[in-house]
């Protein structure tokens, strides 16, 4: 039995949900998001909360039960508060700046890396060594942050590179003479 799926998803103030068949559409102050659930679960709005129930006791139905409930919760958090990923840049000469909708990264290559901001996400660089990725879609925000980090992952010897804020990089000792 799914313990996650049992809890109903409360709708915060200013957020409305509408169910059409297996699709739930959530509207809030930051925008609108929708999600289509599989046929293994049913969606219902009861007393200002979205309730997800399985259609059977098969293994797949129980898996989809918890996953669907988590997805609905992510929709409500996204349209009410939004999601945010912060990145730090460490290294001599490594820096980031915004030029319109393009993030320009100087990461020690012979050329600057230009990263176009995708639709549905806002990228900002409050400092030269900080990048903030924000949006209402948790998966898209995380993927964009991972794509930026991929240009120069933190290396274990000096710790240079792009890392998530608060990420601990495993450090290695250099060669001994």
Swiss-Prot record:
Gene3D superfamilies: Ribosomal protein L6, alpha-beta domain
Annotated Gene Ontology cellular component terms: cytosolic large ribosomal subunit
Ribonucleoprotein recorded as keyword: yes
Domain of life: Bacteria
An MF annotation (GO) of this entry: rRNA binding
Pfam families: Ribosomal_L6
GO biological process: cytoplasmic translation
Keywords recorded for this protein, A-Z: Ribonucleoprotein, Ribosomal protein, RNA-binding, rRNA-binding
Function recorded in the entry: This protein binds to the 23S rRNA, and is important in its secondary structure. It is located near the subunit interface in the base of the L7/L12 stalk, and near the tRNA binding site of the peptidyltransferase center.
UniProt record similarity statement: Belongs to the universal ribosomal protein uL6 family.
Subunit and interaction comment: Part of the 50S ribosomal subunit.
Protein name: Large ribosomal subunit protein uL6
Lineage: Bacteria, Pseudomonadati, Pseudomonadota, Alphaproteobacteria, Rhodobacterales
Gene from which this protein is expressed: rplF
């Amino acid at each position: 039995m799914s313990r996650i799926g049992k809890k109903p998803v409360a709708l915060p103030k200013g957020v409305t949900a509408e169910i059409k068949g297996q699709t739930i559409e959530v509207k809030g102050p930051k925008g609108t998001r929708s999600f289509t659930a599989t046929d293994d679960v049913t969606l219902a709005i009861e007393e200002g909360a979205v309730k997800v129930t399985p259609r059977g006791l098969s293994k797949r139905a129980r898996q989809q039960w918890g996953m669907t409930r988590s997805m609905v919760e992510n929709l409500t958090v996204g349209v009410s508060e939004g999601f945010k990923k912060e990145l730090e840049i460490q290294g001599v000469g490594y820096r980031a700046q915004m030029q319109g909708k393009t993030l320009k990264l100087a990461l020690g290559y012979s050329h600057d890396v230009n990263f176009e901001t995708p639709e549905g996400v806002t990228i900002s660089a409050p400092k030269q060594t900080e990048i903030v990725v924000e949006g209402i879609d948790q998966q898209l925000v995380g993927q964009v942050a991972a794509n930026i980090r991929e240009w120069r992952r933190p290396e274990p010897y000096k710790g240079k590179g792009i890392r998530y804020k608060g990420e601990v990089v495993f450090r290695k000792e250099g060669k001994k003479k």
